[in-house]
Curated annotation (Swiss-Prot):
This is Succinate--CoA ligase [ADP-forming] subunit beta. Keywords: ATP-binding, Ligase, Magnesium, Metal-binding, Nucleotide-binding, Tricarboxylic acid cycle. SUPFAM superfamilies: Glutathione synthetase ATP-binding domain-like (SSF56059), Succinyl-CoA synthetase domains (SSF52210). Belongs to the succinate/malate CoA ligase beta subunit family. It comes from Rhizobium meliloti (strain 1021). One of its GO terms (molecular function) is magnesium ion binding. It comes from the Bacteria. ATP binds at residues 46, 53-55, 109, 112, 117. The keyword Nucleotide-binding applies.
Length: 398
């Protein structure tokens, strides 16, 4: 689960991290009062959407010469003018895709005099099975580009969960960022604070880009992105309360109600699979044969007939879907239950696109018999390769 920048900063501030004063607003009428609460005279007006690249983004409605989604303002009047310009319009960034995201809230923040911009993130490093800091002196820019062109400028430091952030870790991180004086002292206080927040709140990513050294020598969290482990949300009611469903795909929200793992993609072949690994393999083979998956959908290992029906409804709710591939390996889940769920869904939604079903495992012969004797226009496949070729051919021939 993702949250907005202003929410992430409030959370980090509660742990003691140095962040600027700021006020979130939801209408342009609130802009003047918000700005007057801040010291000034420099302000930053930030679009709040769940996507990166806001500063370089462009508003659809304002034309190519308009300013981006993060703007400096040197007076309260400029803050108000920018708020009117930005709220309600659609911001397109490299992460939103061409559709963009509507800006429904802004964060008005006190400006800072920046000397250096650094990069810091905390994530789970699965290669070593530990939480790790990733830092770079190249902050304020695309860290992926840094990793590609100058990987030597990125330093990763894994943290032993039994010891926490040690003095040795602090020295390594501060040295990697070339910090001295007050900035180094600030950083050595900040790193354990961020680690504590990451672990206690079950985050999956905490990214500060940039982490800045100001001209007065002090450090500040200038931007913050936080993602949480969805499997741990049951023990964090305060985090769940921060969820903004307007930033999420409607189909993903619906899927979460039925405990379905669904992610919308840009292709035209809908997929319903049990097991994340099999789902990824299914998407890979669809791409191998020249098509694109419309979604990732894992119905899990013990899905009921009703759950399968709901999964089918979610897939068919996407107008981009021109064909559907169901790929099920029945272990805990029985193939006859899947077959009945698929057929019930086909009848209920009045399916108008090609459907290929590949079943294997428990009660597979009974499952195939149910499908073959249904009288419905369902294409049966013997294996995954056969299934992928059949659905791609059916979609391209439609």
């Amino acid at each position: 689960m993702n949250i907005h920048e202003y929410q992430a900063k409030a959370l980090l501030k509660s742990y003691g991290a140095p962040v600027a004063e700021g006020v979130a607003i939801f209408s342009a009428d609130e802009a003047e009062a918000a700005a007057k609460k801040l010291p000034g005279p420099l302000y930053v007006v930030k679009s709040q959407i769940h996507a990166g690249g806001r500063g370089k983004g462009k508003f659809k409605e304002l034309g190519p010469d308009a300013k981006g989604g993060v703007r400096l303002a040197k007076s309260v009047d400029e803050v108000v003018a920018n708020a009117k310009d930005m709220l309600g319009n659609t911001l397109v960034t490299k992460q939103t895709g061409p559709a963009g995201k509507q800006v429904n809230r802004l964060y008005i923040e006190d400006g800072a005099d920046i000397d250096r911009e650094l990069y810091l993130s905390i994530l789970v490093d699965r290669s070593v099975g530990q939480v790790a800091f990733v830092v770079s002196t190249e902050g304020g820019m695309d860290i992926e580009a840094v990793a590609e062109h100058t990987p030597e400028k990125i330093v990763t430091v894994a943290i032993d969960p039994e010891k926490g952030v040690t003095a040795e870790n602090l020295k390594t991180l501060a040295d990697a960022l070339k910090l001295e004086g007050e900035a180094r002292a600030d950083a050595e206080k900040l790193f354990p604070i961020l680690y504590k927040a990451f672990v206690e709140k079950d985050m999956s990513l905490l990214e500060v880009n940039p982490l800045i050294v100001m001209t007065n020598g002090r450090m500040r969290v200038l931007d913050a992105k936080v993602s949480f482990d969805g499997n741990a949300l049951f023990r964090h009611e305060d985090v769940v309360a921060l969820r903004d469903t307007t930033e999420e795909d409607d189909k993903e929200i619906e899927a979460s109600k039925y405990d379905l793992a669904y992610v919308a993609l840009d292709g035209n072949i809908g997929c319903m699979v049990n097991g994340a690994g099999l789902a990824m393999a299914t998407m890979d083979i669809i791409k191998l044969y020249g098509a694109e998956p419309a979604n990732f959908l894992d119905v899990g290992g013990g899905a009921s007939k009703e759950k399968v029906t709901q999964a089918f409804k979610i897939i068919t709710a996407d107008p981009a879907v021109k064909g559907i591939l169901v790929n099920i390996f029945g272990g805990i889940m029985k193939c006859d239950v899947i077959a009945e769920g698929v057929l019930a869904a086909v009848k209920e939604v009045g399916l108008k696109v090609p459907l290929v079903v590949r079943l294997e495992g428990t009660n597979v012969e009974l499952g195939k018999k149910i499908i073959n004797e249904s009288g419905l226009n369902v294409i049966s496949a013997d294996d995954l390769d056969d299934a992928a070729q059949k659905i791609v051919a059916a979609v391209k021939g439609a």
